């Protein structure tokens, strides 16, 4: 090593090593901070994906519930149409009976 050099050259070498070491420590610290930010960002992305998946499941349930409600409403509509037809027939028959009754009473 530099053990045989002059004290002045050893001091310069020591300062140079300290400077390089400080630079490397700073770079390493910066890299650790960047890595930590990336891990936290990845963790947040994972949270967001989980929340999106939960929201998607809720939306799917809402859609299924809506489909079920629409099926029930279609059945109710069909029943109401049958009832309307029956009422209409009864009104027509009532009108015919009224005419027959009026004819008999004359």
Curated annotation (Swiss-Prot):
GO terms for biological process: axon development; lysosome localization; motor behavior; neuromuscular process; organelle transport along microtubule; regulation of endosome size; regulation of lysosome size; response to cycloheximide. Keywords: Lysosome, Membrane. It comes from the Eukaryota. Its main location: membrane. InterPro entries: BORCS7. GO terms for cellular component: BORC complex; cytoplasmic side of lysosomal membrane. It is found in: Lysosome membrane. Component of the BLOC-one-related complex (BORC) which is composed of BLOC1S1, BLOC1S2, BORCS5, BORCS6, BORCS7, BORCS8, KXD1 and SNAPIN. Diaskedin is from the ancient Greek diaskedazo, meaning to disperse. Belongs to the BORCS7 family. As part of the BORC complex may play a role in lysosomes movement and localization at the cell periphery. Associated with the cytosolic face of lysosomes, the BORC complex may recruit ARL8B and couple lysosomes to microtubule plus-end-directed kinesin motor. This is BLOC-1-related complex subunit 7.
